[in-house]
């Protein structure tokens, strides 16, 4: 059975909701899913998964959230060849660097040798119906790439 690992950072609950939507779709598609908050796991846990997903918010003027910086740095040192990855997240279009943390994780994953399974999904603040559709399509694309 395909295993997806989702690691998230969430301050307001918006990004955790994003992670849960993706996880629910994975389960609907018959994928085993582990969902964990970024401070409770190690980046090396992605080595056990077929699909690796990070869900993060962007803090302030484009910074990674403090709580996910160590995870990000550890991820950069991994060899994830043969893995499929995807990145989703929330931000605020009020800022010039909308969802920059999503872009940062996208580049970080690419440097690990993992294969990008879907375009990143960026949500403005909280999840709307159109975002749910994009997040579910994101999950479907990752599963299709992994199988």
Whereabouts are the PLM-identified features?
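FMN-binding flavodoxin-like domain, especially the glycine-rich phosphate-binding loop
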Residues: 2-3, 14-17, 25-29, 34-36, ...
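Aromatic-flanked redox-active Cys/Sec active sites in thiol-based oxidoreductases
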Residues: 8-12
């Amino acid at each position: 059975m395909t295993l997806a690992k989702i690691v998230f950072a969430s301050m307001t609950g918006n990004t955790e909701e994003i992670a849960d939507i993706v996880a629910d779709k994975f389960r609907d598609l018959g994928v085993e899913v582990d969902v964990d908050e970024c401070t409770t796991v190690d980046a090396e846990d992605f080595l056990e998964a077929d699909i690796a997903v990070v869900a993060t918010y962007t803090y302030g003027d484009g910074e990674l959230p403090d709580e996910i910086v160590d995870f990000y740095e550890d991820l950069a040192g991994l060899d994830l060849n043969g893995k499929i990855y995807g990145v989703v997240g929330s931000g605020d279009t009020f800022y010039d660097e909308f969802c920059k943390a999503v872009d940062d994780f996208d580049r970080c994953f690419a440097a690990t040798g993992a294969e990008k399974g879907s375009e990143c999904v960026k949500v403005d603040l909280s999840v709307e119906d159109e975002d749910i559709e994009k997040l579910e399509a994101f999950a479907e694309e990752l599963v299709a790439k992994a199988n």
